[in-house]
Amino acid sequence: MRNLIIALLMALPLSATAQGIIRHDTPKPQRQQTTKKPAAKQAAKPAPKAADPIKKLYSDMVYVEGGTFTMGAKADENYWDVEHAWPAHQVTVSGFYLCKYETTQALWQKVMGRNPSLYRGANHPVESVSWNDIQEFIRKLNALTGKHYRLPTEAEWEWAARGGNRSRGYRYSGSNNIDEVAWYKKNTQDRHKPVGTKRPNELGLYDMSGNVYEFCGDGYAPYTADAQNNPCPAAADGDHPMRGGSFVGDEFDCRCSCRFGQSPTYSHNHFGFRLALSQ
């Protein structure tokens, strides 16, 4: 009997194992750790090339439709030297193209191979140029492009500054609030600014008030009360009109009517220009 009990006890573990009652812990398979490969570094993209300033000039020309307007200071305008803008008179101008920006240092450098400006910046207006310097620049530019770029006449300049056929009669070019449209002595810290950073006028032209004075192509002569068609006077004393005011000028300098004459040989760090294009 004792031997039978011992035999039964010895058989129990074997039976339990066979039936799965007794389970042995099986080690879980470990997950194989994968090492992430570092992402391949993308090659740095080259900086975009600056647009060719000569090609950009043509795309920046704005067509100014012809029309008739009153040129000169209105009767209620009263500022220093206003007598040079009297008498107001009727003028008719034909359509022409005018650059929406003042001529930049980048364009001058491209054409002339040098930069005469005192305050540097590729997208700033070129300055420290005389009327004679500008004529040499234009000759070289036209030889390079085969086009007929030129300075606007004084009548063309004022017609465009006033907004042409879209004019709303503003005192300054594009607004009666000078700070919206002009860089002048109260907001510049005596430095010109990149072109096109203020609000444009009704035609999409920038900086027609302020930033740098702009030479015109015709001669500076006293006004008369006579109506005129495309006036282009000869220089009475050799001077040429300057328009628009500058970063060192007062508010009245930036009025659309304000004008003065300058010698063709004289340059200054607030004298610049913008280009017109004949049709």
Regions found by a protein language model. Give the residues of each.
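Sec-dependent N-terminal signal peptides
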Residues: 4-12
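Extended beta-strand/loop cores of jelly-roll/beta-sandwich
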Residues: 5, 16-155, 239, 259-279
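Surface-exposed recognition segments
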Residues: 77-91, 165-166, 188-191, 208-279
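Proline-centered structural pivot motif
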Residues: 116, 181, 230-231
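Feature responds to low-complexity, polar/acidic, surface-exposed segments characteristic
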Residues: 117-121, 172, 225
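Short active-site loop/helix that positions an aromatic residue
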Residues: 159-164
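Beta-propeller blade termini and top-face loops
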Residues: 174-177
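A short, contiguous structural element within a folded domain that forms the immediate neighborhood
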Residues: 180-205
